[in-house]
Amino acid sequence: ETNDPETINKATELLTEATNRILKWRAWDPWWVEEVMDEWLITRDRLEVQLRGKYGEEVINDILRLVDRFVEYSEALWKYWHETGNDVEKLIEDLMSGKAVVIIRGEGGVSVHEERIMLKVDKTSTGITVQLKLNDLEGVTIKVPDVFRRTMSEEEYERFINDVLKALRGGLEETDGFVDRSKVAMDTMQVWQAVVWALLYPGRARVRISAINVNDGDVTIAWRLRTSRESLKGKILNIADKLSDEGLLAFMFTAILGDGCVRIAKDGRGNDEAVIKIAISDEEFEGWEPLLWRLWDRFRWHKYPGNAVDNVVFYSGYAIDLARAMISVLPPILKDILDALSFEKWLNIKRISEMEVKWRRGEMQIEVAGYKFTVDVQQDDTVVLEHRAKDDTEVDGVISALRARYGDGFAVNIRKSGRYRVVAIPMYIFERYDDIKERVIQVLCKKLEKTKDERRRVITKHLRRLAPIKGAAAANTTKT
């Protein structure tokens, strides 16, 4: 028992949120189980359509039987919920009438027990989690087919399992895995992840529903899968220098599926920009560094520290190159299965891989007095060098560095752009300085090579002004 008013108030807030969510979704009714069953059946249909005609009947039927086991287990949950849903209603009634026995777990958690259901509510760094734990729904053992062995030659399979498959497992385990009774396991709310995880671990696996998540926006099932294999967590990172290029890319692929974000954003000029990000905890980042530095030569990345997390981000052409390279190491049947599962992260990786590499972030920049400036060919028929500063202090630092290098008469323009301050060097200023002009010419030549539209004529005109010989050569190329 506790009489501390603050502790009681916090517990009351958690229970109020849980009660509101359960009432909102009528979680005691089995409608949400039926939606999950429908999702599994849709997944089954998509797999059959995608794979039929490409692979043998035995392979396809084995995959469909795997999905059928999840459907059967969902049906068992549906029957179970018809019998135990009343426990949820009673739990809510007891909470509202003050009859419930509430267990306070520290400052950020409470629990309420019924005969077959336990309500578990926790305050996290990102919000409140509300779970209904099932006390007596048994798990099931499923047999997972080795679809890779059946779709590869013996030589291909041997190479795949010793290199790529091990790395694919390692990436998933590093981001989403944990050890359960000495074996590797994971919890997921996603149907696609349950299928992919299972297929990467052929043999026998144990599946059980560990909890029902009553979220603010929906009700989901937490699936727990435990394989018969020892965990690789931490082991792949320890041998990053020994991974093949294919293994390195396979590891990154599943790590990004686990803890990554893949999207097409808009850059500062409104153009599509590919972005691939993976979040790594502060305490784990040191272990990741050897692997990340192996990627550096081909796929440059940026590190952005966050709240106990480091975000490693690949932009533009480097993100496109990484997406293409990761897809290239996947076996055909895995790509077909991912296509059938059709989940957002995979679709975005494919979309990025199909984008045209117009530039790689930093490729259209030059360094002036120790600061990076983007070479911007503007619509008003001029070229400007722009540096985005986060605040006035950085602006003052840029101006001081420029004038220390080129003299007090070095003029710049300052303007606001969203949350940034832009330091702009006009063309009539930078063309007076040969070292700056030479770097601008190199970037304009790169732009010219990668530009197909009317802007080629504009770039050629500027090259003629800055470097008459190169400009003339570019003009001849444009005409032909």
Model region roles, listed by residue range:
Residues 1-480:
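Internal intein/HINT superfamily modules and their associated LAGLIDADG
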